[in-house]
Amino acid sequence: VHKLIAIAIVMILAFNVAASEQGGFNEETSVEGTDIISIDYPHQASAGKSFGINVKLTEEAQNNTTTVNWITQICINSGICYPPETNSLENSGEGIWNGTIIPGDDVTYVNWRIDLIDSNENTTRVPENGFGWKVWSDCWYDGSEWGGNDSSCQDDNDDNVPGFITPLTLAAIGTAGLMTRRD
């Protein structure tokens, strides 16, 4: 009975994790209460095309900020996310910092956050933890369905297990195995 309960709990948790993210919906963190007034960016990423942002700082931050870094992470249609990369934004004057990246051919979405570095080398992250923004591409795969307004990246061979599901399955099996060993 304990084994059955443990397996049921693991399956419920795995389903909740898999269902918690819905493909194609962009995410945006509020900049209220930060040194950032606004962030302008495209609301869709495209493979091989420029993806840029403009960050406008408060007047106080303009006088004290020496560097603005854009920490990006690109996730691809196979379910893999590349390690985060630091991109230094250029100060174009009047408190506006801008930069550009070019996502690869199989981009699913772009995650990012902003790091503000002051003259004392203190770093303020927006948001404090994780990535605050996620912008989906015009041709994406979220592990169960294709989406976007461009179908050129879609793989006709859907016989394999999607990348997002494999780690969840392995975690569920491992947790169930550990729980049954304790009994």
Residue ranges and their predicted role:
Residues 2-6, 14-158, 183:
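Glycan-association/targeting regions that enable binding to alpha-glucans and other polysaccharides
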Residues 8, 17, 172-174:
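Generic low-complexity, intrinsically disordered sequence content enriched
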Residues 170-183:
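C-terminal membrane-anchoring or membrane-association module
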Residues 2-10, 166-169:
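Sec-dependent signal peptide recognition
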Residues 154-168:
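Juxtamembrane/start-of-transmembrane alpha-helix segments at the extracytoplasmic/lumenal side
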